[in-house]
Amino acid sequence: MALTIEFSRRSTTQLQKILEFYDERNGSPDYSRRLLRCLLEGLQRLAQTPTASSPSTRPDVRFFYLMGFTIIFRYNRKRLTVLSISSSARKPLKLYVKQ
């Protein structure tokens, strides 16, 4: 059974900025729509098998690479919460590294 997918405020803001960047760069929302659809489809597959992702240094946080993006999330028996979405071409996020 697939988990319910939720987005944190941070990941929602990050996703909006990513989509706006591609809208401006391409002069059209077409690519952004396709990108969003592919990201959501990937998250739906991830919600079915969240352990098919990579563990982080924190036991409750995992990450997944999809279409050039790093998706950081946590999950429990009922939901998968997307914590962050960033371009894999950027510096890796250090927000979820156990200190």
Model-derived segments and their meaning:
Residues S11, L39, F73:
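GIY-YIG nuclease signature motif recognition
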Residues M1-L36:
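Arg/Lys-rich, positively charged N-terminal/basic patches that mediate binding to nucleic acids
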Residues L66-F69, R74-Q99:
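Enriched for short, Lys/Arg-rich terminal
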Residues E20, V61, Y96-Q99:
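Short, glycine/charged-enriched secondary-structure capping and boundary segments
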Residues L40-Y65, L93:
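A short, surface-exposed loop/turn module that caps and links secondary-structure elements
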